[in-house]
């Protein structure tokens, strides 16, 4: 697909004179365009759901979720991956973000990195990609060689693959087994795909990782019951989670958390089933870490 024919490279009539308007009007134009992004994502919800189910199946069998992208797309993958361990208590490395150009590229532009097909393949080889893993290629344009080559290599290994782009019929979409293509239209600043396209990608990644964690028992109701308390704010959040899940008071919640080394799931089962920490942990282990299943046990 030629660059000039891509939707993400088109000219947006709504912002054609954005350099001549007031600051407030400038913000309104950008905001009006941003409002269209959730609707574009809504149109591809079935594709997102299908990807979540595949990701969950593979991760449940011992695989990993691997994000692969360049520039903004790569940074968004790293952002999503880095939030999973503290939010959901998963081991670092279960969700991985790879960016063309390596760690330096997180904060700096690396010339030619996104054009390196070899880079996409080598980065996957360096993390010992296996057929059990899922590779999610992220590229607003859908034409990034680094991502396309990575997806091709992943499919050769037998991996399940997902392609996220904002141009229908792109190479990323056709290379991946599952295509997620929120079409957000031309950007306010022509070709600046960090804007609407980047926002759409972030919304999709939010759903992929959150959906995986919900289906993996990391959420009870709408509570992040595997959160790791790495600071005072999260210590307080743990107490509130146990309170909200059980109806107990703050003192009871804190006592249960202390008794089980600050594991929210265990504390919740302790309170609701009147068990000690060891009994509650055993009960959870017997039910794959799912609180709801543990509570249904006679």
UniProtKB/Swiss-Prot annotation:
GO terms for molecular function: carbohydrate derivative binding; carbon-oxygen lyase activity; ether hydrolase activity. Induction: Induced by MurNAc 6-phosphate that releases the repressor MurR from the DNA. Repressed by MurR in the absence of MurNAc 6-phosphate. Its EC number is 4.2.1.126. The keyword Lyase applies. It catalyses: N-acetyl-D-muramate 6-phosphate + H2O = N-acetyl-D-glucosamine 6-phosphate + (R)-lactate. SUPFAM superfamilies: SIS domain. Pfam families: GKRP_SIS_N. Belongs to the GCKR-like family. MurNAc-6-P etherase subfamily. Specifically catalyzes the cleavage of the D-lactyl ether substituent of MurNAc 6-phosphate, producing GlcNAc 6-phosphate and D-lactate. Together with AnmK, is also required for the utilization of anhydro-N-acetylmuramic acid (anhMurNAc) either imported from the medium or derived from its own cell wall murein, and thus plays a role in cell wall recycling. This is N-acetylmuramic acid 6-phosphate etherase. It comes from Escherichia coli O1:K1 / APEC. The gene is murQ.
């Amino acid at each position: 697909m030629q660059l000039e024919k891509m939707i993400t490279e088109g000219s947006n009539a709504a912002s054609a004179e954005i350099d001549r308007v007031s600051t407030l009007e400038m913000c309104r134009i950008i905001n009006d365009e941003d409002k269209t992004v959730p609707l574009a994502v809504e149109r591809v919800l079935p594709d997102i759901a299908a990807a979540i189910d595949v990701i969950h199946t593979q991760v449940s069998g011992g695989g990993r979720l691997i994000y692969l992208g360049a520039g903004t797309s790569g940074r968004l993958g790293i952002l999503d991956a880095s939030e999973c361990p503290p939010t959901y208590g998963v081991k670092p490395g279960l969700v991985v973000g790879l960016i063309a150009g390596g760690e330096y590229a997180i904060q700096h532009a690396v010339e030619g990195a996104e054009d390196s097909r070899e880079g996409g393949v080598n980065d996957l080889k360096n993390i010992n990609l296996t057929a059990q893993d899922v590779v999610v290629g992220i590229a607003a344009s859908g034409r990034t060689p680094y991502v396309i080559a990575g997806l091709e290599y992943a499919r050769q290994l037998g991996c399940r693959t997902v392609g996220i782009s904002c141009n229908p019929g792109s190479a990323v979409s056709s290379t991946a087994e599952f295509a997620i293509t929120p079409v957000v239209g031309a950007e306010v600043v022509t070709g600046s795909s960090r804007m609407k396209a980047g926002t759409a990608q972030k919304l999709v990644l939010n759903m992929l990782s959150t959906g995986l964690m919900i289906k993996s028992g990391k959420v009870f109701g709408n509570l992040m019951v595997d959160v790791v308390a790495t600071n005072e704010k999260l210590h307080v959040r743990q107490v509130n989670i146990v309170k909200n899940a059980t109806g107990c008071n703050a003192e009871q919640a804190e006592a249960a958390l202390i008794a089980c080394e600050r594991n929210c799931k265990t504390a919740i089962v302790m309170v609701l089933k009147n068990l000690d920490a060891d009994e509650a942990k055993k009960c959870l282990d017997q039910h794959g870490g799912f609180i709801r299943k543990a509570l249904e046990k006679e």
